[in-house]
Amino acid sequence: MTVKPLYRRVLLKASGEALMGEQHFGIDVSVVDRIAADIAEARGLGIEVGVVIGGGNIFRGVAVASKGGDRVTGDHMGMLATVINSLALRTSLHKIGVDAVVLSAIAMPELCESFSQRQADAYMNQGRVVIFAGGTGNPFFTTDSAAALRAAEIGADALFKGTQVDGVYSADPKKDPNATRFERISHAEVINRGLSIMDTAAIALARENNIPIIVYSIHEKGGFGDILRGGGRCTVVADD
């Protein structure tokens, strides 16, 4: 029996740190390949997929600012890190026969196309995976905010946030053994409780555009596909 997926079009946000695997820096190709396989599974279900990847495995602009450096320049460097990660994911997708394209918020035509909402929509309608690089193209905005923005622009039915844990918890489960996982929670409650799944601007933007956020563990092999079919372990952030 074929299970009909719950969504037509989704945006997947993966942190740059997730790409490190067990390393302390850079890209673990096996991890990128696994994420690519999860995306391929979603495409096999007929779901259109957009992707935003952070750059924290290579560079974080906010870290520069915390040490007295220039935040704007640091953020620009972080944007370049997201392009590196996006190209790595595109390569992994191409290896398994999935058509993918990188659209960057920063013009660099020798490496990838520049972002255009219309072009992104057209590519997704054609069944291509669209990887959005370069954040929003502006400093002081996180890649979480970029993910929420792109999700709104492409009309995504949901924003999937692949994290280090399998959902939203009342406290950090790595520090508090009594932390409990929410099955469902509203955007407003996430903000009011100060739960750090995404920055406040990203959550607010998703809320304003009625985009549910699905928080799950990106390290769970096949977890993305399980949730797309209506199963899996996750937290749904949505207003009733």
From Swiss-Prot:
Activity modulation comment: Inhibited by UTP.
Pathway: Pyrimidine metabolism; CTP biosynthesis via de novo pathway; UDP from UMP (UMPK route): step 1/1
InterPro entries: AceGlu_kinase-like_sf, Asp/Glu/Uridylate_kinase, Uridylate_kinase, Uridylate_kinase_bac
Pfam families xrefs: AA_kinase
GO cellular component, one term: cytosol
Description of how the protein assembles with itself and partners: Homohexamer.
Protein name from the UniProt record: Uridylate kinase
Binding site for ATP: 13-16, 56, 60, 163-164, 169, 172
EC number: 2.7.4.22
Organism: Mesorhizobium japonicum (strain LMG 29417 / CECT 9101 / MAFF 303099)
Gene Ontology biological process terms from the UniProt entry: 'de novo' CTP biosynthetic process; UDP biosynthetic process
Keywords, ordered alphabetically: ATP-binding, Cytoplasm, Kinase, Nucleotide-binding, Pyrimidine biosynthesis, Transferase
Reactions it catalyzes: UMP + ATP = UDP + ADP
Keyword match Cytoplasm: yes
Subcellular location: Cytoplasm
Binding site for UMP: 55, 75, 136-143
MF annotations from Gene Ontology: ATP binding; UMP kinase activity
Family: Belongs to the UMP kinase family.
Biological function: Catalyzes the reversible phosphorylation of UMP to UDP.
